[in-house]
Amino acid sequence: MPTAPQPLAIEAADGYRLGGLGWFGAPGPARPVAVIHAATSVQCRYYSRFAAWLHARGHDVILYDYRGIGLSRPARLRGLRASWADWGARDAEAALAYARACFPDRPLDAIGHSFGGWAIALAPSAVHLRRIATVGAQFAYWRDYAAGQRWPMVLKWHVAMPLITALCGYFPGKRLGWLEDTPAGVVRDWAWPTPRFETRPGGRRLLREQGRYPAAAVRAPLLAISTTDDPFCTPAAVERMLAYFPASPSRHLRIAPGDIGVAQIGHFAFFHSRFEGALWPLVGDWLAAGAEASRTASAR
C-alpha cells in the first residue's frame, strides 16, 4: 500500500507560508531526498502518484505549491506579489532549504517540470544539489514554440492571457479551463516577449538582488527530458535554459511518442500514471545512479 503523504508548512525567507506534501520513510544517511518543482499554475498534488512511486524506489520526496497556487493560495489573489522570479528565488529556494534543514546529511536531488526546471535555476540552494532532472523545462520564449502552433500559442498566452489579467487583477484560469488562477506578476513574466529571462520584469529585479542567477554556480549533473510533441519545449527552448547552467554536465534526452508505442505525450502527460512503466524510470534511474536510462527513448 502506498505511503500517505504528510502535510508540510514551509516558510519562505520573506515570511510567506507555503503548503506542501511529504513522503518520508525510515531515516538513514544514504536515503536521498527529492524536491519536485511544479509547472506554472499546476497544483503540486498533480505529482502525487509520481512522488509515491519515487518514494517506493528509495527517495524521500517533497512537493510544494508556489505562492498563489493550491495549498499556498491566499484568500485573495489580486495584489499578491508573486512573479516567476519569486517562485524561483523565494519559493523553490524555501523548499530546497527546508529539505536541507530537515535532512542535512542526505543527498538532495531536484525534479522540475516546465517552469519548475527554471525555478531551480533561480534558487540559491541549488548549488547543493546532487542531481537534477527536468521535464519539458523552459521559460516560454515565444519564438521557441513549435512552428506549426506558434501563433495560436502567442495569441493565447502572450496576448489574451495578459489582457484578461489586466482586467481582472489576476488570471482567472479556472473559469476559463486553462490553468489554476494565476497571480498577475507570474503572467507578466511569462508573457514578456524577450529571449533572456534577465530582461523580463521579475528577472531584472532578481538580477539586481542576486548579482547573477544561481544556475551559474550549479555543478550537479542535469538530465533535460523533452518530447517531440510538446509545442512549448522545442530543442531551442531546452538549449536556451541549459545555457544558464554552464557548469552542470547536461544531457538533453528527446523522446518521440512512437519510441514508447503511444500516439502522444505532450507537455503535461509525462507525470500521468499511465507512463509509470515507460517514462518514469527515465527520471528515477537518473536520480538513483546517474544512469541515462535510454532503454525506451532515443537521444537527439
Give the location of each predicted region.
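Alpha/beta-hydrolase-fold enzymes
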Residues: 111-198
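Short beta-strand/loop motif that positions the catalytic acidic residue
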Residues: 218, 224-226
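Active-site glycine-rich loops that stabilize anionic/oxyanionic intermediates
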Residues: 31, 39-42
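N-terminal cap/lid segment of alpha/beta-hydrolase-fold proteins
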Residues: 1-25
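Catalytic active-site module of serine/aspartate enzymes centered on a nucleophile-bearing elbow/loop
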Residues: 251, 255-300
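Alpha/beta-hydrolase active-site loop
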Residues: 81-102
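Conserved alpha/beta-hydrolase
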Residues: 44-76
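Short alpha-helix in the alpha/beta-hydrolase fold that links the catalytic acid
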Residues: 234-244
